[in-house]
Amino acid sequence: MSDIKNITKLQIEDKGKKYSLYSLKKLSQELGKDVTRLPYSIRVLLENQLRNIDGYKVKEDDMHKVLDWDAKASSRPEIPHMPARVVMQDFTGVPAVVDLAAMRKAIKDAGGDADKINPLVDTAMVIDHSVQVDFYGTKTALAQNVAKEFERNGERYSLLKWAQKAFDDFIVVPPGMGIIHQVNLEYLAKDALVKNINGEDVIYPDTLVGTDSHTTMINGVGAVGWGVGGIEAEAVMLGQPYYMVLPDVVGVKFTGKLKTGVTATDLVLKVTEVLRKHGVVGKFVEYYGEGLESLSLPDRATIANMTPEYGATIGFFPVDEVTLDFFNNTNRSELVDAAREMYKEQLLFRENPAEEPEYSNIVEIDLSEVESNLAGPKRPQDRVAFHDMKKAFAEALVHEQGLHGFGLTDEQLQKSAEVKGLNERITHGSVAIAAITSCTNTSNPSLLLGAGLLAKKANEKGLKVKPFVKTSLAPGSQVVTQYLEKANLLPELENLGFNLVGYGCTTCIGNSGPLDEPVVEAINEADLIVASVSSGNRNFEGRINPHIKANYLASPIHVVAYALAGTVDFDPVEDAIGKDAEGNDVYLADIWPTTEEIAAIQSHVINSDMFKKAYATVLDGTEEWQKLKAPEGKLYEFDSSSTYIQCPNFFEKFAEGNDDLDIKGARTLLMLGDSVTTDHISPAGAIPEEYPAGQYLKSHGVEKKDFNSYGSRRGNHEVMMRGTFANIRIRNLLLDNVEGGFTKYHLDGSQQYVFDAAMKYKEKGIPLVILAGKEYGTGSSRDWAAKGTFLLGVKAVIAESYERIHRSNLVGMGVLPLEYVNGQNAKTLGLDGTEMFNIKNLNNIKPRQIVIVEAVHPKTAHTTTFEALARLDADVDVDYLKNGGILQTVLKDIMGDKKESKSTQSTTSKGCGSADTSSETSCPFAKIANFFKKLFK
């Protein structure tokens, strides 16, 4: 043990138990450095470095880098962060389990111990991303959707049930139990973690990474955690540090108090707007100020949940008494007293509201000025005041086509269509989906109870939801339905069609299910811009439903209100929402619940026993899960005929070095604009029959009704590489006025599917690049957006800016992210995407190095030369690029192969199946197996 660890070590005692810790208070005293000047979130990183010093992965110098954090530094060092936990959801978790299973097979084939591949940190997977809203509006909807879910996903779930038994320190929360971040908040997270190390119980703060961008929700309880790609999570699971550059920390000072009727949803949409404008991408955000005193823990969690939408790495609330009360009230009181003492000894307990650590920048938000809000129609940061919605939607209809509008003509504005069988006409703005969904809001009891109260008052007035609105209630945990039932508000919601459809992500991630066919026909007949209103966290175009172009985020209370109105072309102050039994106009003000009404109900319907009951059997799962058959043993047998799960091919040519990283004669696969999301790059929703992924499934005997979604097939790289850049709403600027997954094949000028063109380039040995604008890769922490890019043969992306997780994922797959400098972009440089690109001198590249890019016009030979910043932000990023990715680097470490090998991309697709792995060509992992044979000799 290092001297500094010995010096700072002390013990605390609680309820007769002794706990060791490494004290930041003692560290501060011994070194004469003021730890309290550091933001709380940086202090958590400091404790992590101090506790994990081993002279190998974490060195004392790494701890000093954090201790010396400077709020105004122009450059920052890299540290090896050691998260205590990993959380995963099934869309990102299935491919991770497939990777681990394939690695085990490789070791076994080499005569080694398959247990060498096993999680070394606690890992939990919550299955929540697969349930779809096929059935709604009835008491049987839940059972029908669950049955359909298991019918579609039996093979995937069997794999995960196998993993539940096959891996140590790996738990699976079965489907139907809740949403990952709400389950994490209510059950998995602890007020403090305890681990027995060399016979001593060491107590320390919770830290984690998760394979979902909204992992940040846990920042609401003072846990430092954020979303990463699946490949990064796998590395952490296998005991690797998470290498990160110390961030700037933006302090957000809350003052005042929310007005009555204004909710946490209204606040977080305001915060998202403000921080997007301020610019916090890649930075920590930390909340402080006297305004925190009035925010409940669920309010804080709602704000932390949407951290990816405002672009930060974390949105952190320090631990205080509100935090510990939450753990007490949710059946996790065992360690509360010990945790309090630990946090105080670590200088991590917020006691003085006036305390103001040093921040890189400060943003002030007066809570009393926040008003009722929505966000849309296409981005979470585009806030619209509730009272301005009618005007804002009208403006969006005629605003030029793009991020803010739909570009309708006067003639198009007049269109409407009849919905057959309903005696109703719909027009622009008609609400086709109203969904109470997402952990963002369903984790907050005040919002759900508010929606129930609005429903109750609407029922008392005799109001009805418009029949063309698809309504749904999908809570993030079973606690929600317990307290709604206890408050007698669940029947009120059901009476308006908000029946329980599932405990999962559903509409929020695009699993809204099909609209009724007569509604679809009416939309298509008049080419209508219809709307969705959901309590989710993302509203990117094409995400919620392919037939809905205007998507608004709102509180559950607003969701019920717009379901009643039937349109977003509605003034909530001036327009009546309906008529009562006597024919009198009813206005929203007549039925809107007050903050006081909600609080009065909340105080007597929620208790810790609800959480105890909901989570007592959470790992047992539903009857369907218990009946599900799963393989036994340490090894998973891949089935070469499966269209869901295949042995991944990321390690083909793994053992071969690539001595030349330079990119020569690359062509542009896509030329994209601003705010291209990971949904655009790798959609999670429906698979169109005519697209390459649909054709692949048909060729393997899968009927259209059984296609399921892209997200559910992430265990099969053949489907996913065909689904890359296959979003039906993506716009490739290489083509004029074309929407969807198409590109121009430069060698003959033809329009082709992106996948088909990429494979032709691959056959000819032509490397590829992508040109993009600002905020490239915004949205979900979808590692398949990078994996698919890699498999298509893309060597580099050149963009104006990147979202944090996607940049990291690209590097993790051996794809070079480059950034324009000096305010340049494709337009200012005169690039049209037809050029051939040369990017040289990459073999000795350094972090954040300026590289020279040559763009040669193929007809005139005119060359445009410009500089670009290599977004390899740390030394380890360079290693990943040279080795071809994170997992390749990890495997080289495991196998003791110290020589540098260069990235080699391949799109040759061979599954392991049951083929003879004695032949290196029969399985991509056979090459790895040969390394293991040397290792285990």
From Swiss-Prot:
Source domain of life: Bacteria
InterPro entries from the UniProt entry: AcnA_IRP_Swivel, Acnase/IPM_dHydase_lsu_aba_1/3, Acoase/IPM_deHydtase_lsu_aba, Aconitase/3IPM_dehydase_swvl, Aconitase/IRP2, Aconitase_4Fe-4S_BS, Aconitase_4Fe-4S_dom, AconitaseA/IPMdHydase_ssu_swvl
Catalytic activity of the protein: citrate = D-threo-isocitrate; (2S,3R)-3-hydroxybutane-1,2,3-tricarboxylate = 2-methyl-cis-aconitate + H2O
GO molecular function (one): aconitate hydratase activity
Matches recorded under CDD domains: AcnA_IRP, AcnA_IRP_Swivel
Pathway(s) per entry: Carbohydrate metabolism; tricarboxylic acid cycle; isocitrate from oxaloacetate: step 2/2; Organic acid metabolism; propanoate degradation
Keywords: 4Fe-4S, Iron, Iron-sulfur, Lyase, Metal-binding, RNA-binding, Tricarboxylic acid cycle
Name the UniProt record assigns to this protein: Aconitate hydratase A
Gene source species: Francisella tularensis subsp. holarctica (strain LVS)
Designated gene of the protein: acn
